[in-house]
From Swiss-Prot:
The protein's name in its UniProt record: Transcription initiation factor TFIID subunit 1
Position of the signal peptide: none
Single GO biological process annotation from the record: negative regulation of transcription by RNA polymerase II
Function field: The TFIID basal transcription factor complex plays a major role in the initiation of RNA polymerase II (Pol II)-dependent transcription. TFIID recognizes and binds promoters with or without a TATA box via its subunit TBP, a TATA-box-binding protein, and promotes assembly of the pre-initiation complex (PIC). The TFIID complex consists of TBP and TBP-associated factors (TAFs), including TAF1, TAF2, TAF3, TAF4, TAF5, TAF6, TAF7, TAF8, TAF9, TAF10, TAF11, TAF12 and TAF13. TAF1 is the largest component and core scaffold of the TFIID complex, involved in nucleating complex assembly.
UniProt KW S-adenosyl-L-methionine keyword: no
Taxonomic source organism: Homo sapiens (Human)
Domain of life: Eukaryota
Length: 1893
């Protein structure tokens, strides 16, 4: 059998297949002409052998076909009908020695039975379905399928494989020669003995040659089982069958037991004899006789497999899966316990192992792990892969049988199909005809071009010589071509060609001729298919014309060699190193490995894997901010200390400083223990933000020498310290030891300059930059203070490094570049993914607000665009207003998220935005930031400003490009961070040398040399050689040169000497431009100079003094002079005028600063007078300040004094030191300029004069050009003209602009007039007309056409000019309420809150509280079994025992559905969880205890919030309210809405009658009434009894009778409404009676209280009203308004009245008379009549009706819920806050009075806020919240009702009324545009709201 697949698939057999063998036998036996051929029954009688009787019925050919028909599945019936016990026995049991079938005792004769055969299709399908997938093996191509039926194939059938044979396991056992006693399970290389050993299973798969059997197996099958696959073998004698070929030989495509494929069996050319096959066989046969006879089976097996591979038919089967795609069962079996079989090794093996070395070569190779797991000893003794040696007693029989079978196959080879060689291209093409034996034969023929290129040059008419052939083929004509050559033939595998690999083929693992030894892995370094290392990338040398350059190179080669020898120029051998050179075959020196390599950008010597801390890699928030504002960006390189708002350090006072020595040692010990516990070695400790603290570990300080480094690491990022060392030539002592870092030996320097031999340079190196560092000694007096919120810590500092200039390795993206935008996008996406990962909900969800908070600069649309990729926005349901993760979206893993954005990308982005902010602060617009395109970059670099050129996106880009060799760096220039030439300027310059303007080189005279004696063409050869002798060139070298080579050397050497300033023959010098090589050399020298200088300066330990530094004032003087000149040219002013203006401006600025400083210090300033008039100003607040008074003399001789303020401490110290220690003479000398300074001044003056000349020249050019074209600039200026100053009234600036003349006069009143002036109107007309180009006025004859825009603009100007504007200061002072003078009440002040805030539904507030309690319970430990409903599949009997299940998720859903209006219902359901757990688990179970702890936590939380929850429950259900009036009104309102309005066809009575539709209604009906009006009265608490309520209800019926008549349908409906009302009142009679009594009692108590308060003595004033009659209906309103005055003076506490509880009283205050609250807001009282008349005048028509109508549209039942404010706190009602009680009156009279005057007035002005509280009392009632923050009363907020919210329009109207007060239409007209403006205020006075703005 096929040993390859045998090895591979026996693993699967041991695991899966042994127990599930098919019950049915395979059809192979019968189909192949076995003893039982059931197909024979169709054509005649069957003899005892199971074959057809007689020879006359069918001829031999038909019988052959008949034997093949067994493949139709008929053969499987025999085994079931006759031999059930075959499953346990072997096939050989039924076969006699001659191959005939024996009859058994229980055999039954079926010949006479005429029955319909049962349908066997199911069994056949089952058998077909049990085919195994194919498997290719590395060892052999003959495979066999086991006939077992895999369960997995039933569950999910694989793609249909090509049909393969199915054999019974019994056959395989006999074939493989396994003994019957159950010993022979065949194992692969490492496989454990399986428990399935009782059934011997041999599992194999099939390749394309499924039907072929190995020769060894074929012979065994014939000898042991007697089963032959020959046609009609069953009716022949055994000896006769040997002479016949088998059916598989005649028809290789035949499959025993399968459906016949005739096109495959009898295809065209199937039986054509193969010409070459017999010859091949004979050769092999001769060869085989010489070798061992065991190899016969190998060769024959390969031959048969090759035959079987021939197929002209293509099938649509799935391809056989390669072995790597099959399940690796070796792993499973290898992990199983292994029973060692090494003890079974024979003596032969021991003899072999004795000769081996002690340790086997293969034992510790790549497979060491597996050998260790199998327990293989070191010497490898006893290891046999589980193979077994061949049994010796059977060998002669097997050999003879194999030889016999092989001879038989050899004799019958003529009938076989074509061999495999016939399908090779070499046998199909007539390639012999194309061989050119003689070139003369094809000289006149044309060759095919594709073959000609392969054949090489052949002489022909077209290509007579090799050169012509090369030109035709496009080859380079030169012989010294540098391109590498490759062989067209693949490299031979020596093992395949010369090795005995066929000896290692495993034909039978159970019968091995010898045991194989594991091979030793060897890699051939010469194998081109092996990639042993990553090859270096070679940059292609781009050149336009290589051929020209090569010509120049060859022609100049000699002169170059000579010049190189004389030292004029240097030969650069490494320039030609980039291209591979043809190596001299005799040069064995390997010089190319010793050449210095070109240094690339990332010269990472040694490993450079940087492992950042986990918080940095995860981009956690504080370390990697998502947004940085301008202030943070300005402080990016120098972050200030954070001010703590809480914690110990937020308070002033002494704070202790803790040492850290013990903490450091303790932490080090802990980390060492952790390292040891993990097995020692390196360990990564930076895992949490706490690990990043400086309170433990080793610390070093690194001070960056650059002010604004191009790249800065964020907190938590790592860097390496590398110690670069360059060895000395010869004997090197090695690198000196360093305390920090790893030593790296480098030949080429990773910096711009190279290291000297023996030099060591330390460097920071990470993925962002490489920078040299220089260790300095830390002064002993220095230490480190670590500040946290809790306190200070101190620790020692050991070392400090100075960091040199960075060499960027990471490019900073430019603003708005694609890389920057991509980073922003990915950063946002990563943030969103992490938010989803943090979400605890399922499905995961997040809110948009969380993202907008982190990314405030992002638009919502861009965030939404990122979110839509992974989430959906839910508008309804439980997840409303959440973004929920899509169900089909897979969140990226942490590794994938980290790969999206790296910390280095963030750092580069931060560097970019910080630099962008610096440029914006410097005044550069965004257009100057854009990074240029590649092509224009060098030109662009020359044009942009120096500041932009130094931006990090330009410097990093330039440095990286320079390191790649694309350009050079400027080295010295504007981008030098030191500013003094000690650093590199990273600005691009081209590789080619350019003439610098400021080059100090001696320039040759620019004159033509043609025809002069300097013309080199006229120089004779003799004179030229003479010149060379003068230059010192040896004579023998001169003789070697031709004429023009001599001239070339003369020119070069003359140029060199002329450039160095010497040499008499400078006339022959040509060109001052350096060559590229010289330019590169100069560049390297300059880089080296600066590099050495930087190393010297930064490593210097010399202490520099700052005292001797000169002041920078002189430089600023020069700048001022330059600015003055420019201003003089622009403004045509003299220098004296300019200086005066500037001094005046400085004086004003200084004055303003002093005023500001004085006001800020508020009296803390103290003045220290000094003899030198040095004043320290404001030293306590703003630091020291030096004021220097200088005396000047103007042109007229008058003296004046100016004060100069200096704030720099260093300048102050220097000035004071000089003043106090030196005399006047020294100071006078000090002030005089020295010689050097005068020289600098002269240079500066010359520069400024040159600038002046240039400006004049430009002006003259402009004059010559003529007047410039006019450009429409008005379009740009128009937006500015729309601005109007609020201070001075001018147009074009705002009041905050410094150009405003009133900018510094902050307290001066604005000077805007009452109406617009004519000038302002004209300015306004200019701004209003927008389009200048459009013709606004057209004249057509006598007709003038005015544009529509003109008329509209005129109307607008007219309307705006009529608007009166009143400044705040000119308004009459508003009346403020009296404030208590006691200081101790300051803490009662509350922040200002708007009156008309939106009210929150109390159900929402209650639900949010309950949900927070659920969250707290869910966070308790071990509560997860109660989080979700019990799974019925897991706990099957739960729902049989528990009838009312409950869990936290269901509880949360109920809360969100607003199903719990009170605490009791919520707690009841929670208690249900405890009861259910006790019922199912038992009361003592741990789960029951956990649920009880949840209930206890809930009770605790409910107790904490008891007051708030009680208020919310009362608001939800007013019947729970302590105020009886609220409950009474609630019942009445329910009667109206749920009963009376529910009467059918009652809609005409729901709202007032519309006057438009029924014009005469209000003439007939004097007192109209409807259900809506009744509801308003209810909401205003106008009904204290049922009688008053019924009066209004009956009035509806009476009005209907009066207007419609008693018989009208409307009247009947009204009667039904009244009946329903009476009926419902009867139902609630008992409850309503009790409420009426309580209301009456409370009313009487209030009246008594009012009488007591009215007796309080009070001095009457001019505005103090006399207390009117309480029962007078006309004065009741004013009494209610004025009564609060008495109450204000009384200072009575609410607690003084025993008749009501505090809660009741506070709510009663809200329901008291209409005027109480209004007057409480007002604080002062007016005359009652005056107030009514005044407000009557200011009444706007229908205002109250509109408010009432608008307010009632939004909810049917205003009492269904009382809403509290969103915060939910609202200052508890029952807290006993001191609030004055207000008097009570007869409510009915008051309310009737209010009702009568409703159409006449509304309360506005100062009492406006209260009036809305009263008139819209259906919106808000209860306790009132006052807006005045200075109020000493503790108040509660209004609550709205039943999910009822004030509409936004009403809010705006009410706020506008309160802000602007009453508006008298006859006097003031407010324009539509400016009604909302803050400049407009009421005439009567500002409201309280305005005073707080």
């Amino acid at each position: 059998m096929g040993p390859g697949c045998d090895l591979l698939l026996r693993t699967a057999a041991t695991i899966t297949a042994a127990a599930i063998m098919s019950d049915t036998d395979s059809d192979e036996d019968s189909a192949g002409g076995g003893p039982f051929s059931l197909a024979g029954f169709l054509f005649g009688n069957i003899n005892g052998a199971g074959q057809l009787e007689g020879e006359s019925v069918l001829d031999d050919e038909c019988k052959k076909h008949l034997a093949g028909l067994g493949a139709l599945g008929l053969g499987s019936l025999i085994t079931e009908l006759t031999a059930n016990e075959e499953l346990t026995g072997t096939d050989g049991a039924l076969v006699n020695d001659e191959g005939w079938v024996r009859s058994t005792e229980d055999a039954v004769d079926y010949s006479d039975i005429n029955e319909v055969a049962e349908d066997e299709s199911r069994r056949y399908q089952q058998t077909m379905g049990s085919l195994q997938p194919l498997c290719h093996s590395d060892y052999d191509e003959d495979d066999y399928d086991a006939d077992c039926e895999d369960i997995d194939c039933k569950l999910m059938p694989p793609p249909p494989p090509p049909p393969g044979p199915m054999k019974k396991d019994k056959d395989q056992d006999s074939i493989t020669g396994v003994s019957e006693n159950g010993e022979g399970i065949i194992l692969p290389s490492i496989i454990a003995p399986s428990s399935l050993a009782s059934e011997k299973v041999d599992f194999s798969s099939s390749s394309d040659s499924e039907s072929e059997m190995g020769p060894q197996e074929a012979t065994q099958a014939e000898s042991e089982d007697g089963k032959l696959t020959l046609p009609l073998a069953g009716i022949m004698q055994h000896d006769a069958t040997k002479l016949l070929p088998s059916v598989t030989e005649l028809f290789p495509e035949f499959r025993p037991g399968k459906v016949l494929r005739f096109l495959r069996l009898f295809g065209p050319g199937k039986n054509v004899p193969s010409v070459w096959r017999s010859a091949r066989r004979k050769r092999k046969k001769k060869h085989r006789e010489l070798i061992q006879e065991e190899q016969i089976q190998e060769v024959e097996c390969s031959v048969e497999s090759e035959v079987s591979q021939k197929s002209l038919w293509n099938y649509d089967y799935a391809p056989p899966p390669p072995p790597e795609q099959c399940l690796s069962d070796d792993e499973i079996t290898m992990m199983a316990p292994v029973e060692s079989k090494f003890s079974q090794s024979t003596g032969d093996i021991d003899k072999v192992t004795d000769t081996k070395p002690r340790v086997a070569e293969w034992r510790y190779g790549p497979a060491r792990l597996w050998y260790d797991m199998l327990g293989v000893p070191e010497d490898g003794s006893g290891f046999d892969y589980g193979f077994k040696l061949r049994k010796t007693e059977h060998e002669p029989v097997i050999k003879s049988r194999m030889i016999e079978e092989f001879r038989k196959l050899e004799e019958n080879n003529g009938t076989d199909l074509l061999a495999d060689e016939n399908f090779l291209m070499v046998t199909q093409l007539h390639w012999e005809d194309d061989i050119i034996w003689d070139g003369e034969d094809v000289k006149h023929k044309g060759t095919k071009p594709q073959r000609a290129s392969l054949a090489g040059w052949l002489p022909s008419s077209m290509t007579r010589n090799a050169m012509a052939y090369n030109v035709q083929q496009g080859f380079a004509a030169t012989l010294d071509d540098d391109k590498p050559w490759y062989s067209i033939f693949p490299i031979d595998n020596e093992d395949l060609v010369y090795g005995r690999w066929e000896d290692n083929i495993i034909w039978d693992a159970q019968a091995m001729p010898r045991l194989l030894e594991p091979p030793v892995l060897t890699l051939d370094p010469n194998d081109e298919n092996l990639i042993l290392e990553i090859p270096d990338e070679k940059e292609e040398a781009t050149s336009n014309s290589p051929s020209k350059e090569s010509k120049k190179e060859s022609s100049l080669k000699k002169s170059r060699i000579l010049l190189g020898k004389t030292g004029v120029i240097k030969e650069e051998p490494q320039q030609n190193m980039s291209q591979p050179e043809v190596k001299d075959p005799w040069n064995l020196s390997n010089d190319e490995y010793y050449y210095p390599k070109q240094q690339g950008l990332r010269g990472t010597f040694g490993g450079n894997i940087i492992q950042h801390s986990i918080p940095a890699v995860e981009l956690r928030q504080p370390f990697f901010p998502t947004h940085m504002g301008p202030i943070k960006l300005r402080q990016f390189h120098r972050p200030p200390l954070k001010k703590y708002s809480f914690g110990a350090l937020s308070q002033p006072g002494p704070h202790s400083v803790q040492p850290l020595l013990k903490h450091i040692k303790k932490k080090a010990k802990m980390r060492e223990q952790e390292r040891q516990a993990s097995g020692g070695g390196e360990m990564f400790f930076m895992r949490t933000p706490q690990d990043l603290t400086g309170k433990d570990g080793d610390l070093i300080l690194a001070e960056y020498s650059e002010e604004n480094g191009p790249l800065m690491m964020q907190v938590g990022m790592a860097t390496k310290i590398k110690n670069y060392y360059k060895r000395k030539p010869g004997k090197d002592p090695g690198a000196p030891d360093c305390k920090y870092g790893e030593t790296v030996y480098c030949h080429t320097s990773p910096f711009l300059g190279s290291l000297h031999p023996g030099q060591l340079l330390q460097a920071f190196e990470n993925n962002l930059f490489r920078a040299p560092i220089y260790l300095h000694k830390m002064p002993e007096t220095d230490f480190l203070i670590i500040r946290t919120r809790q306190g200070y810590y101190i620790r020692e500092l050991v070392d400090i490094f100075v960091v040199g200039q960075q060499c960027p390795l990471f490019e900073v993206p430019g603003p708005n570049s694609k890389r920057a935008n991509t980073h922003i996008r990915d950063f946002l996406q990563v943030f969103i993914y992490r938010l989803f990962w943090k979400s605890k909900d399922r499905p995961r969800r997040i809110r948009m607000e969380d993202i907008k908070k982190a990314f405030p600069s992002h638009s919502e649309s861009s965030i939404r665009k990122r979110l839509k990729l992974c989430a959906d926005f839910k508008r309804t349901g439980m997840d409303s207003n959440w973004w929920v993760l899509k169900s089909d979206f897979r969140l990226p893993t942490e590794e994938e998220i980290r790969a999206m954005v790296s910390p280095e990308q963030c750092c580069a982005y931060y560097s970019m935005i910080a630099a962008e902010q610096r440029l914006k602060d410097a005044g550069y617009g965004e257009k100057s930031f854009f990074a240029p395109e590649e092509e224009n970059e060098e030109d662009f670099q020359m044009k942009i400003d120096d500041e932009v050129r130094t931006a990090p996106w330009n410097t990093t880009r330039a440095f990286i490009a320079a390191m790649k060799g694309k350009c050079l760096l400027e080295v010295t220039g504007v981008a030098d961070p030191t500013g003094c030439g000690e650093g590199f300027s990273y600005v691009k310059i081209p590789n080619k040398p350019t003439q610098q303007k400021d080059d100090k080189e001696p320039q040759p005279v620019k004159k033509t040399v043609t025809g002069t004696d300097a013309d080199l063409r006229r120089l004779s050869l003799k004179n030229a050689k003479q010149l060379l002798r003068k230059f010192g060139v040896p004579e023998e070298e001169i003789k070697k040169l031709s004429r023009w080579e001599v001239i070339d050397v003369v020119r070069t050497m003359s140029t060199e000497q002329a450039r160095s300033g010497e040499g008499p023959m400078s006339k022959f010098a040509r060109g001052s431009r350096f060559s590229v090589a010289e330019h590169q050399e100069r560049y390297k020298e300059e880089c080296q100079r600066i590099f050495d200088l930087q190393n010297k300066v930064l490593s210097s330990t010399e202490v520099l003094s700052t005292d001797t530094d000169s002041s920078s004032a002189e430089d600023s003087d020069f700048e001022e002079m330059g600015k003055n000149i420019e201003n003089m040219l622009q403004n045509k002013k003299t220098s004296s005028q300019l200086s005066r203006e500037r001094e005046e401006q400085e004086r004003k600025e200084l004055q303003r600063m002093l005023l500001a400083a004085g006001s800020a210090a508020s009296g803390n300033n103290h003045r220290d007078d000094d003899t030198a008039s040095v004043t320290s100003l404001n030293s306590s607040a703003t630091g020291r300040c030096l004021k220097i008074y200088r005396t000047f003399r103007d042109e007229e001789g008058k003296e004046y004094v100016r004060c100069e303020t200096v704030r720099k401490p260093a300048v102050i110290d220097a000035y004071v030191r000089i003043r106090t220690t030196k005399d006047e003479e020294f100071i006078r000398k000090f002030a005089l300029f020295d010689e050097q300074h005068r020289e600098e001044m002269r240079k500066e003056r010359r520069r400024i004069q040159e600038q002046l000349r240039r400006l004049k020249r430009n002006q003259e050019k402009e004059k010559l050009k003529g007047p410039p074209e006019k450009k429409p600039k008005k379009m740009k200026e128009r937006p500015d003209l729309k601005l109007k100053c609020g201070a001075c009234g001018a147009i074009g600036h705002m009041r905050t602009n410094k150009f405003c003349p009133l900018y510094y006069q902050t307290n001066a009143p604005p000077s805007n007039p009452v109406a617009m002036t004519e000038e302002q109107e004209e300015e306004l007309e200019k701004t209003v007309i927008h389009n200048d180009n459009e013709e606004l006025i057209k004249v057509e004859g006598t007709k003038i056409v005015l544009g529509k825009q003109l008329i509209e603009s005129a109307d607008e100007v007219r309307r705006k000019s009529l608007v009166l504007k009143f400044p705040k200061q000119q308004l009459p002072p508003k009346k403020k309420r009296r404030v208590g003078t006691t200081v101790h009440c300051d803490y009662l002040n509350r922040p200002h809150k708007s009156i008309h805030r939106r009210r929150t539904d109390p159900m929402v507030t209650l639900s949010s509280i309950l949900e927070s309690i659920i969250n707290d319970m869910r966070d308790l430990p071990n509560t997860y079994p109660f989080h979700t409903p019990v799974n019925a599949k897991v706990v099957k009997d739960y729902y049989k025992i528990i009838t009312r299940p409950m869990d936290l998720q269901t509880l949360r859903e109920n809360v969100r559905k607003r199903l719990y209006p009170s605490r009791e219902e919520f707690r009841e359901h929670l208690e249900l969880i405890v009861k259910n757990s006790a019922t199912y688990n038992g009361p003592k179970h741990s789960l029951t205890q956990i649920s009880q702890s949840m209930l206890d936590l809930c009770d605790e939380k409910l107790k904490e919030k008891e007051d708030k929850l009680a208020r919310l429950e009362k608001a939800i259900n007013p019947l729970l309210d302590d105020d009886d009036q609220v409950a009474f009104s609630f019942i009445l309102d329910n009667i109206v809405t749920q009963k009376m309005m529910a009467v059918p066809d009652s809609w005409p009575f729901h709202h007032p009658v519309n006057k438009k539709f029924v014009p005469d209604y209000y003439k007939v009906i004097v007192n109209p009434m409807d259900l809506e009006t009744i509801r308003k009265n209810i909401s205003k608490h106008k009904y204290q009894s049922r009688e008053s309520f019924l009066d209004d209800v009956n009035l509806i019926l009476a009005n209907s009778v009066k207007y419609n008549g008693p018989e009208s349908q409307y009247t009947k409906t009204a009667q039904e409404i009244v009946n329903v009302c009476y009926q419902t009142l009867t139902e609630y009679d008992e409850h309503l009676t009790q409420l009426e009594k309580d209301i009456c009692t409370a009313k009487e108590a209030a009246l008594e209280e009012a009488e007591l308060e009215s007796l309080d003595p009070m001095t009457p004033g001019p505005y103090t009203p006399q207390p009117p009659d309480l029962y007078d209906t006309n004065t009741s309103l004013s009494m209610s308004r004025d009564a609060s005055v008495f109450q204000d003076e009384s200072n009575m506490s609410v607690l003084d009245i025993p008749s009501a509880t505090p809660e009741k009283q506070v709510t009663q205050e809200g329901e008291d008379g209409d005027g109480d609250l209004a007057d409480e807001e007002e604080g002062t009282v007016q005359q009652p009549q005056a107030s009514v008349l005044y407000e009557d005048l200011l009444m706007s028509e229908g205002e109250d009706d509109e408010e009432d109508a608008g307010s009632d549209e939004e909810g049917d039942n205003p009492f269904s819920a009382i809403q509290l404010s969103e915060s939910g706190s609202d200052s508890d009602v029952g807290s006993g806050g001191i609030r004055p009680k207000q008097p009570r009156m007869l409510q009915e009279n008051t309310r009737m009075d209010m009702e009568n005057e409703e159409s006449m007035m509304s309360y506005e002005g100062d009492g406006g806020e209260a009036s809305h509280g009263l008139e819209d009392s259906n919106i808000s009632y209860g306790s009132y919240e006052e807006p005045d923050p200075k109020s000493n009363t503790q108040d509660t907020s209004f609550s709205s009702i039943g999910g009822y919210e004030v509409s936004e329009e009403e809010e705006d109207e009410e706020e506008e009324e309160q802000r602007s007060g009453p508006s008298v239409l006859s006097q003031v007209h407010l324009s539509e545009d400016e009604e909302d403006s803050e400049d407009f205020h009421s005439i009567a006075g500002d409201s309280d709201l305005d005073s707080d703005e």
